[in-house]
């Protein structure tokens, strides 16, 4: 892998995780729109955006291959439900002053990925990975025991996205085709909800100001652009290298929540964050050690 490819991959990875990290600022701009409606716009406009991208890149043969494989279509139906639920929970959390907990979910996610890899893919834990996962578990249990609360939103986001990643890994479909089929599965539900069920001051596009409609349509761009950057990075970087960028997103979310949106982290959250951050430091140092040994 040459230096130019690596540099391009790093820039694409930075772009992907930067956009994911500041995405809450976009959702805050339209926080007066119900989360369910924002989700429908995210699905609808992502579908049309992906249609345009696949047409421009002439990748319809990939779509036909997937459509002709019932197992992959069924797998993408399940992944569509998971990613749809993840999107809805994330939008609701951001627009109801739970951005800190959303960031916690994406800090926890890499550790959940490791657990699912062991349970479903037969991957073996290294000793320090066990320590990291146990440390994260302790953080959640301490919050439950001491403060009588569970980070439900964080756990929901972490596990839904981890299971989504597991299914996508199992069915092995490229990112563009996968997102097109997933949004196609969700499209009828989104259309029925938006045009037949939703009743709110913003549910009728013809009555909205054009500026709001443009922001709602931008949901497709906010969804697909970082995904394409991530896919481009994944093809140019080692997976172990790419993994170190994944903490940019939740770190930016945490900073946005505290500095710009006035979410004060209470003692319960800070205790949990402390355990999770310690677990992630152990996790990253272990990965660096293994990477150096392989070299």
Which sequence ranges carry the predicted segments?
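Membrane-interface interhelical linkers
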Residues: 1-15, 48-76, 127, 179, ...
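Glycine-/small-residue-enriched transmembrane alpha-helix faces in small-molecule transporters
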Residues: 1-37, 141-170, 192, 256, ...
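C-terminal-most transmembrane helix of multi-pass membrane proteins
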Residues: 2, 247-295
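Hydrophobic alpha-helical transmembrane segments of multi-pass membrane transport proteins
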Residues: 18-22, 26, 77-94, 156-167, ...
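Structural motif at transmembrane-helix junctions in multi-pass transporters
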Residues: 32-37, 88-105, 228-245, 264
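Alpha-helical transmembrane segments of compact multi-pass small-molecule transporters, enriched
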Residues: 45-49, 105-119, 189, 245-260, ...
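Helix-helix packing/entry segments at the starts of transmembrane helices
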Residues: 104-108, 175-185, 224-259
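Hydrophobic transmembrane alpha-helices of multi-pass small-molecule transport proteins
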Residues: 128-144, 157, 268-287
């Amino acid at each position: 892998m040459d230096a130019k490819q690596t540099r391009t991959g790093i820039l694409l990875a930075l772009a992907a995780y930067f956009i994911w990290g500041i995405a809450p600022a976009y959702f805050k701009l339209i926080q007066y729109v119900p989360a369910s409606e924002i989700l429908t716009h995210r699905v609808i406009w992502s579908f049309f955006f992906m249609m345009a991208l696949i047409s421009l890149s002439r990748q319809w043969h990939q779509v036909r291959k997937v459509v002709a494989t019932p197992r992959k279509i069924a797998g993408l139906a399940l992944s569509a439900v998971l990613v749809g639920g993840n999107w809805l929970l994330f939008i609701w959390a951001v627009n109801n002053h739970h951005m800190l907990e959303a960031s916690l979910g994406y800090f926890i996610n890499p550790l959940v990925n490791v657990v699912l890899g062991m349970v479903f893919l037969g991957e073996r834990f290294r000793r320090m990975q066990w320590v990291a996962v146990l440390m994260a578990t302790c953080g959640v249990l301490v919050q439950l025991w001491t403060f009588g609360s569970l980070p439900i939103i964080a756990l929901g986001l972490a596990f839904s996205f981890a299971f989504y990643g597991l299914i996508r890994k199992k069915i092995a479909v490229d990112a563009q085709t996968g997102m097109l089929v997933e949004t196609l599965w969700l499209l009828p539900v989104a259309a029925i909800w938006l045009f037949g069920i939703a009743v709110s001051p913003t549910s009728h596009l013809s009555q909205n100001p054009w500026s709001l409609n443009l922001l709602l349509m931008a949901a497709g761009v906010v969804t697909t652009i970082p995904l394409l950057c991530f896919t481009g990075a994944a093809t140019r970087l080692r997976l172990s290298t790419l993994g170190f960028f994944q903490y940019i997103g939740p770190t930016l979310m945490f900073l946005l929540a505290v500095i710009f949106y006035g979410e004060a982290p209470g003692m319960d959250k800070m205790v949990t964050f402390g355990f999770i951050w310690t677990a992630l430091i152990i996790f990253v140092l272990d990965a660096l050690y293994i990477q150096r040994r392989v070299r």
